Structures are given as C-alpha cells and as structure tokens.
C-alpha cells in the first residue's frame, strides 16, 4: 500500500530587504514546478504570500532538504548574488544526521564528483559518485554529536560545501561510509529509491529509511551586502530534532 507524504508549506522568512529574502524551506516541498503535475512548490507559495514580486532562487535545495534558501527579487540582484556564489563569497552551512559513529572529529573531502551513469551503468540517472575524472569538489565535515535511536548508532555532522556540485554533501558522506539517514539514493545502494519509484511510499520503506525525508538541513547562510554582514540561521526541524532525542 502506497502512503502519501504531504508537502509541508509552512515556510517562514528569516531575513528580508528590498533586494532579496532568505526563506526557511520545509521538506519535502519542491522548489519550482516540474511541468509534470500541479504539485505545491516553494515558488508558488512565495507568489501567493507576497504577490507582485518576481522571485529568483540563488541557491537550490533538494525536495527533501530543508532550510535556508536565498531568493532575489529581481534578475539584476540574482545575477550579482550568483556571481558572489561563484566566488565563494556566500558561505552556507548544513547539518546532516548520518548512520554510524565517525572516528574523526573533522575531515575535509576533496574527491571529484561525476554523474555515475557517465562511467558505469546506473539505474538512477541523477545519481552522482566520486570519480577521478569528475568535477573538483570540496566539503568540510565536523562531528557535532553522537546518539542512539532504537539501539542503532547515529551522528550529527556539520557540513560546509566549498563547491556546488549536485548532491555534493550526500555523495561525500556516502564516500566516507556515513550515509545520510533517509537518503533513498545514497544509502542502501539506491534500492530504496527504486522501490519508491515502483511502489511509492510504503510502511516497509519508512521502516528501512527511519524518516520520511533525508536528514539534511541547510542551517545557515552568511554574506556581505551593501557594507553589512548578513547572517541567517534556521533551526533544525521538529522531525529531525525528535529523531535525535528518541
């Protein structure tokens, strides 16, 4: 029996000025229309909440990732912020709950990333992987805490992506041997994702994944704007907080 996971749409505005706003995106809210359905999107709820403004996403989060999204209110501001992002002048920080207890306090992963289907057969088109001929990638990780849930070991990891590759944090954590809880593509060798496509969300899949979303949260963003340092922080969502203290 397939279960339906309703999109959470109760986003909040963390910071705002005449040029941009930073919103706190819930999961599993998708960012923008895909053309395949009339599914609720962050772009749609923004337009409903703040009519008359054209929005441009400066950074993007996967459907199942929550947290800070920087949104420009004009194309010119979007271009400027995009260039700042390319120059690494916008710093982003994440939190991830992973399976297992790492034996390190801090580690920096610089393994290049490439779409897996480009170098070997993959049933999941979008899946990425570490590969020597991939694009240069760098992520810093910091162990923030360890805990148990249902007798199993888990850890909270602080993540700082220093490049912007697709699924970068998820790929590098899988490479380290500590996949993100609830990640259907980069844990269980992707079998959960294929099962989800075939059967939808089921009670059996929830039992395997432990969460109805991947445990990755865009915690903060910091950048300079018109002579001021802008910083926004998003609290860990209730469903992830509850998992840590269960």
Predicted features and spans:
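RNA pseudouridine synthases
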Residues: 1-138, 142-151, 229, 235-246
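Pseudouridine synthase
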Residues: 38-42, 46, 145, 151-223
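Short strand-coil-strand connectors
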Residues: 224-228
